Amino acid sequence: HPLLGVELGWPELLARVQQSELLGFDSYWFSDHPLLNPDCWTRIAGLATTTRTIRLGTMVNCIYYRHPALLARMVSDVDGMSGGRVILGLGIGDFVPEFDQLGLPFPPTPVRQRALEEAIQILNGVWTDAPFTLEGETFRVRAAHIQPPPVQQPRVPILIAGAGEKVTLRQVAAFADASNFGPNPHTGNVLGSDAVRRKFAILARYCTQVHRPFASVLRTHWSPPVVLAETAASLRKKVAAITPDEHRFYGEHMVIGTAADAITHFQQLVDAGLQYFIVHTRADPETARILAEQVMPTLVPARQPLAL
């Protein structure tokens, strides 16, 4: 797909994820666009038994594409298959054509936001020891109970994507283990270090309201394509392969250059309070290697405390 990146066949994907594991990456993530890409959960299930240490996440699972009770069953099974390595990224969906293709209504944003809370209630509820019932606005379950539960307890870590200051960041504080946003419209439109700091100041206030330590939220970032090379010739070849659609969609947010360019880019975001980067490498092994060997070891934790 022109925007979702290079789609790898299974043998190529397995080799790429295993390479990422050997390079020391913490996790590998999959989008949830079932008519555009292979199913994220099928691929995670396959990787659960063919990798050993790397965590496997969704960036992000749309709550409308699978009923939350069914999703709870799938996540619990795959978490068990992987030995407790699943991260459940959740979102409310924003790609109207995909909803149309799947024959699904596209409710207004407030309805989808409330549905996210219902979905998390169901996930949490059916993973407990007792049957769980919820009569929600969007989702309903009656005396539902998932056994065996996930390996990770009390639940699989949940990430909520988005940067909305009135609702989404409040939901992160109330329900999630991790936040996530990025610089383009589909990932929160959070542009630059000052905007990142603003979002975290707001998130910190919501954490205070629910009596939760701000530090208990893992602050993650969805990074648009990163294209790195050791030589100018290699970089020119990679830049030439970037599609017009990618240029239009990601524009100046792409990180193109050397390890030094990437270090400067990511260190600024670390200094703004980000802790964890989910990086789109365009399935390029050299970019992944440069990130692992030259960029990641060089980044240092925030040099100054967040002004919250």
Regions found by a protein language model. Name each.
Residues 1-308:
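Active-site-adjacent structural elements that line small-molecule/cofactor binding pockets in enzymes
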